[in-house]
UniProtKB/Swiss-Prot annotation:
Alphabetical list of PANTHER family matching this protein: CELL DIVISION PROTEIN KINASE, CYCLIN-DEPENDENT KINASE-LIKE 3
Stretches the record annotates as Disordered: 362-427, 448-513, 551-586
One cellular-component annotation, GO: cytoplasm
Enzyme Commission code(s) on record: 2.7.11.22
Organism: Mus musculus (Mouse)
Protein name as it appears in the record: Cyclin-dependent kinase-like 3
Record's subcellular location: Cytoplasm
Polar residues bias: start-end ranges: 387-397, 468-491, 499-509
Motif [NKR]KIAxRE location, chain numbering: 45-51
Record text about domains: The [NKR]KIAxRE motif seems to be a cyclin-binding region.
Catalytic activity: L-seryl-[protein] + ATP = O-phospho-L-seryl-[protein] + ADP + H(+); L-threonyl-[protein] + ATP = O-phospho-L-threonyl-[protein] + ADP + H(+)
Amino acid sequence: MEMYETLGKVGEGSYGTVMKCKHKDTGRIVAIKIFYEKPEKSVNKIATREIKFLKQFRHENLVNLIEVFRQKKKIHLVFEFIDHTVLDELQHYCHGLESKRLRKYLFQILRAIEYLHNNNIIHRDIKPENILVSQSGITKLCDFGFARTLAAPGDVYTDYVATRWYRAPELVLKDTSYGKPVDIWALGCMIIEMATGHPFLPSSSDLDLLHKIVLKVGNLTPHLHNIFSKSPIFAGVVLPQVQHPKTARKKYPKLNGLLADIVHACLQIDPAERTSSTDLLRHDYFTRDGFIEKFIPELRAKLLQEAKVNSFIKPKENFKENEPVRDEKKSVFTNTLLYGNPSLYGKEVDRDKRAKELKVRVIKAKGGKGDVPDQKKPEYEGDHRQQGTADDTQPSSLDKKPSVLELTNPLNPSENSDGVKEDPHAGGCMIMPPINLTSSNLLAANLSSNLSHPNSRLTERTKKRRTSSQTIGQTLSNSRQEDTGPTQVQTEKGAFNERTGQNDQISSGNKRKLNFPKCDRKEFHFPELPFTVQAKEMKGMEVKQIKVLKRESKKTDSSKIPTLLSMDPNQEKQEGGDGDCEGKNLKRNRFFFSR
């Protein structure tokens, strides 16, 4: 109840209270039925039964259940708010409803009863208080606390149901083998009250009601009279024998001809002789002068208008005795005038709209001007992207969480199966984030190269080394000799060891900083990195080598300075081989540096 603001009390009954409330976030006015906290199991049974039926059956002439929750051990049912009933109409029109209004109301009430009976449901409490009337004139049947399915042959029902004034004779005599005709009897009593403004069988006890039934409707059948004679409640009571008119119009003179025929078909003492709701809808009272053909479009327009205004949220089930929502969707039975069920307008329709809007946004994001351009990714990343795309096309992804995160960076495949984007800085990240292509030190990189083909980079590095070596040879060409070959080899080995040691320090330092989990280390996929940084480092090391050679040239004779241009080709190939090994070590260290 924290989400709702109480505005007042609407009604109160033997099983609970109905409050008028306002949703604090949306401002929607709702009616909340609060069941009393009683030790009897009957209260929970009635609440559970009403929840079950309202979840399972939806119709435009049945009240809509919005939400169910339990607070302080009390069950709360949230309904659409309609504060007007047929009883309020009768209090306003003391002499009964006008004929046009009465026919429209009865047509909708019969449609609701027919829908329930076609699904083998008995309401068992039809009365003016349980017929809601909206501002546009749409009637909705409510209060399903006594509703239940038809029993199998041999099963029995509860004997004390329905309000006394509208109770059929088999219910008064506590016959447990009743069925749909009890609703038809209650409808007949209510029709007379709606037409005249006065209840037809007001009574203070079951005996009083039974006496009035015999006087106004007819004598008991042999089966019912046998139950009456054996009942200890009516022991010693003798019912009168009354002669009644045979025609309906003489029996109910206050009603017009066709309406009297409907009431006479409903109020039959024998349940087997009572008419059905389907036959009543086909009666001349509704089919004459094209009433149905004219009223159906009007009713459809009113339903569409109310559906736009009252787009209710689908109930969030917090009641432990409720069935799962997935099972509910399979068992919902509808019978509507619309192309869809107006009772289901709400979260399901909003979810479909969000799905369509999401598709439009995805199309716009792919074809817009501000998109990130597509780049060539390694093959293993392409596989992950295709798999993620296939997963996103499943309907369950839209039902659970729309993958809006894909629009921000469509090139980033670091998303789990639920469409939730993972933190790229977390230790469990599966793939490194993309490289910023605008960095100044990456302008010379080849973005289309692959990690599986490092030969091109080694070739470029070898060319750079040769170019720098030739520069050294041109500078010192007048003072080189072949005698000091071992000295030059030792110098190069020292420089190589120095570079390797520096790279090892850099890689070990990066290992300590990153501190990735061991279990995830083998599953990292590293993106393509250029070779520019290492090329610059090697260039700096060669400059240092030049300075060392210059200092040695000043101390030694010119005859002892080696010449790089006149080196042996075999020795150059050997150095190239060492360079390849060196390049592999640098490549391995570069991976740790990139991490």
